[in-house]
């Protein structure tokens, strides 16, 4: 299933001694996560929401943030993508707006990370969002049943349709969102899913589905 829609139009505190945040949760315990958010070059972004999955803070006027996070429970540190900016992508077209907490960081009880976003040169409010769901690739030898996109062959058709649709849109940015079940209870096929995303030519945001977690 796929559809497309378009709207109408090393880290230091940087002098933030008073925790003068733009809003959100104020840390009261030991600081275990801190960093900066940049928006192209040396521009530091204020008011960007940063979360450890439980607590949320906003960057101050210097783009600085800190969280008193329980790193024994925290898996990722994420940043909201501020208006007027886009997230950089990896080689597969996955947007990078998060940091995975490492075992070394847990041992040290400290995460220091810098997020960097890219200014959007054209109208950031004019874009097309291509939404898909349930690619659920399975081995080519799995055969077919009543479930759509049962095999990798069907997934390739799915990716081709999205790629061809995106190619017709030249006057605005294109983004994708996959609404879960990117694989069918077989994470060994995740690399095949990524190979499909790599052909799309636009960034794909992904949401966890039950078959991805079972």
Name each model feature, range by range.
Residues 25-26, 98, 102-189:
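N-terminal active-site segment of His-dependent metallophosphoesterases
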């Amino acid at each position: 299933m796929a559809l497309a829609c378009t709207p109408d139009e090393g880290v230091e505190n940087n002098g933030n001694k008073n925790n003068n945040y733009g809003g959100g949760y104020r840390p009261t315990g030991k600081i275990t996560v801190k960093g900066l958010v940049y928006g192209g070059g040396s521009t530091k972004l204020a008011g960007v929401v940063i979360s450890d999955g439980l607590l949320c803070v906003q960057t101050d006027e210097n783009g600085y943030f800190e969280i008193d996070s329980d790193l024994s429970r925290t898996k990722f540190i994420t940043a909201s993508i501020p208006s007027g900016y886009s997230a950089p992508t990896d080689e597969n077209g996955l947007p990078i707006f998060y940091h995975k907490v490492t075992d070394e960081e847990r041992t040290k009880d400290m995460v220091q990370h810098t997020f960097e976003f890219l200014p959007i040169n054209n109208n950031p409010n004019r874009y097309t969002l291509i939404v898909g769901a349930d690619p659920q690739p399975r081995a080519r030898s799995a055969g077919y049943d009543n479930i759509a996109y049962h095999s990798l062959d069907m997934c390739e058709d799915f990716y081709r349709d999205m790629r061809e649709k995106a190619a017709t849109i030249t006057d605005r940015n294109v983004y994708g969102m996959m609404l879960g079940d990117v694989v069918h209870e077989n994470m060994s096929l995740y690399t095949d899913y990524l190979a499909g995303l790599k052909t799309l030519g636009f960034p794909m945001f992904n949401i966890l589905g039950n078959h991805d977690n079972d």
